[in-house]
Amino acid sequence: MSLKDSAKIALSLMDLTTLNDNDTDEKVITLCQQGKTEFGTPAAVCVYPRFVPIARKALKAQGTEQVKIATVTNFPHGNDDIDIAVAETKAAVAYGADEVDVVFPYKALMAGNEQIGFELVQQCKAVCQASNVLLKVIIETGELKTAELIRKASEISIKAGADFIKTSTGKVPVNATLESARIMLETIRDLNVADRVGFKAAGGVKTAEEAAQYLALAQEILGHDWVNSDHFRFGASSLLTNLLAALNGQANQKVSGY
C-alpha cells in the first residue's frame, strides 16, 4: 500500500483530539473545522465533556454530522474511585457524547488489585450501553510498562465489557508504542473478541509513516478487513497536518503536539 493510500485510511480512523487545560469553545470549533478536509473526515473528534454540545453544533453547521463525538472520564489519572468514574461517565453521556474514553485504574492494578478495574469498567459500560454509547478503556501502557501488566489490563477491560482498548491518555511521558500495540492486538486475537473489541493508539503517532506501521501491525494480527473505524482508531491532533501533507504529496514535516 502506498503512503498516500495508508494516509487516507489513517485520516478516516482518527479521533481528532484536543484535551488541553486552555481549551475554549473557539478552539473546539476550529478543531471540528480542521476535520473537514478534501480527503474526507475523521471518525470522531475527542474533547472534554463540557465541549461536547459545542462540537455537536459545529459539526452540524459544517455538514459533517457523521463525525462522532468522543470524550474522556476518570481522566487523566485513572483514579480508583468507581463512584466518581461512573458519575463522570453519566455526565458525559448526558452532554451527548457518542463515545466515552475512560481511564482504567492502572495504578491499582500495578499494586495488585484486579477487581477494582473490572468493576469500574463494568459499571461505566452499563451507563454507556443504556444510551448506546461506545466505551473505550485507556489502560495507560506507558505507565504499566511490562507486557504482563499491559496484557492483564487489556484482558480485564475486555472481560468487563470494553468496546475498545486504548493505549494512552497522551498525558504521560510514554504513550502509544508499536510494542504495546502488538500486545493489545494479540490479546484481542487470543480472547477471540475481534468481532466486538477494537483498538486505539493514542499519543505519539505523529507522522503518516508511523500511522502506516500501526495499520500494518493490526492487519498482520487481525486481518486486512478488520482495520476500519468500528475496530481501529488513532487518538491524535498533530497527526492530521502530516497526513494531509502526505496526501498532498508534500515532504513530511515533523509537528509538535499530541
UniProtKB/Swiss-Prot annotation:
Major enzyme class: lyase
GO cellular component terms attached to this protein's record: cytoplasm
Gene3D superfamilies: Aldolase class I
SUPFAM superfamilies in UniProt: Aldolase
EC number: 4.1.2.4
Presence of keyword Heme: no
First-listed, main subcellular location of the protein, grouped into a coarse class: cytoplasm
Annotated GO MF terms: deoxyribose-phosphate aldolase activity
Transmembrane segments: none
Locations listed in the record: Cytoplasm
GO biological process, alphabetically ordered: 2-deoxyribose 1-phosphate catabolic process; carbohydrate catabolic process; deoxyribonucleotide catabolic process
Pfam families reported in the protein's UniProt record: DeoC
InterPro entries from the UniProt entry: Aldolase_TIM (IPR013785), DeoC (IPR011343), DeoC/FbaB/LacD_aldolase (IPR002915), DeoC_typeII (IPR023649)
Keywords noted in UniProt: Cytoplasm, Lyase, Schiff base
Family note: Belongs to the DeoC/FbaB aldolase family. DeoC type 2 subfamily.
HAMAP family from the UniProt entry: DeoC_type2 (MF_00592)
Function as written in the Swiss-Prot or TrEMBL entry: Catalyzes a reversible aldol reaction between acetaldehyde and D-glyceraldehyde 3-phosphate to generate 2-deoxy-D-ribose 5-phosphate.
Protein name: Deoxyribose-phosphate aldolase
Species whose genome carries this gene: Actinobacillus pleuropneumoniae serotype 7 (strain AP76)
